[in-house]
Amino acid sequence: GVGANGGGGGGGGAGHANRGGDGGLGGAGGAAYGDAAAPLAPGSGGGTGYDPGGKGGGAIRIEADDRVEIHGTLSVNGSKGGANSRGGGGSGGSIYITCRRFAGSTNGLISAQGADGENNQFDYCGGGGSGGRIAVLYDSTAQAAEPRPAVRFRAYGGTSYNPLAGQSDDGTLYFPDPS
């Protein structure tokens, strides 16, 4: 998970759902970990470049006997390191929801994004943090009677200022059926 320190170059981005991006002329990205269908682990911190990398996102677990409605923001995004730090981006955390029925509006956002790597010089920038993991498990039969939820989901991986190195991959979204 944790990105490697840069040793003078950019710190590696933290891994979670996927491997973190490598730092420019520096640290390797962190390894992937966790379970897409039952995500409970928080995100990891990015590797140190000149200053420390960003922090990983936390973990949210919601368990309900019947209905969960999302009309606001649930966020476990990773964070960037300090400005001009060469630090790797922190990875997104985990959001795990189990319920009978799931609903929400267009104001609803569930987010586990990885943070961008920080910049100092083009070749020495930090790697991006991996996106996190989001799983919403519901009863498929009960859910079929509901309107399709308008909730938005984001689990993008962080980027790097150097497009030749440091990009991370997106996180995972898991639902019990593809509809």
Feature names for model-found ranges:
Residues 136-179:
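Extracellular/surface-exposed low-complexity segments
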